[in-house]
């Protein structure tokens, strides 16, 4: 502060009638006066100081005034800090609000996507089911029924042809089974099952016949 203001020890009156020379002494440096040009009140005060002669008490008061202004400037410097902290708190609050909003938006988006997927699955048409994709019903030989498999019934023509084939061959090869299935409009499984049942029946008949022959032979031996 001493560089900007006249020293208080500087004599107010000069000997030898040199008081007129006092008004020519600049009270401020050139750099300080340049900075004061931006503030009209400060430059006005500077011109008044150059025109008039003041006592040391005035300089002290002026220094106090400027010191107060300096203190106010320090307070002014602290004021933006307060605003900065307030801005930071506001920014943090806005960030939290934005995070909450984004979470809510995410929840709503997820629910909307879920509903869209649900409705899309409902609106989607069913996959076409072709005859070869359906289960074969053994009751009538027609596809499309998924109930319990019933007993297969054969027509007289089918039964006659199968009996002829069984009379010549009790066991069928794969090629022969395919040929018969195409000729009688049956599946390979149906023909295979028919031959299995027919062989079981044939075995039972032969067993009964053999047991009857054995019993007859035993009776003839006892009688003889």
Curated annotation (Swiss-Prot):
Record flagged with keyword Transcription regulation: yes
Record keywords: Developmental protein, DNA-binding, Homeobox, Nucleus, Transcription, Transcription regulation
Superkingdom of the source species: Eukaryota
Role description: Sequence-specific transcription factor which is part of a developmental regulatory system that provides cells with specific positional identities on the anterior-posterior axis.
SMART domains from the UniProt entry: HOX
Single GO biological process annotation from the record: anterior/posterior pattern specification
GO annotation, cellular component aspect: nucleus
DNA-binding residues: 147-206
Localization in the cell: Nucleus
Protein name: Homeobox protein Hox-B6b
The keyword Transcription regulation is assigned to this record: yes
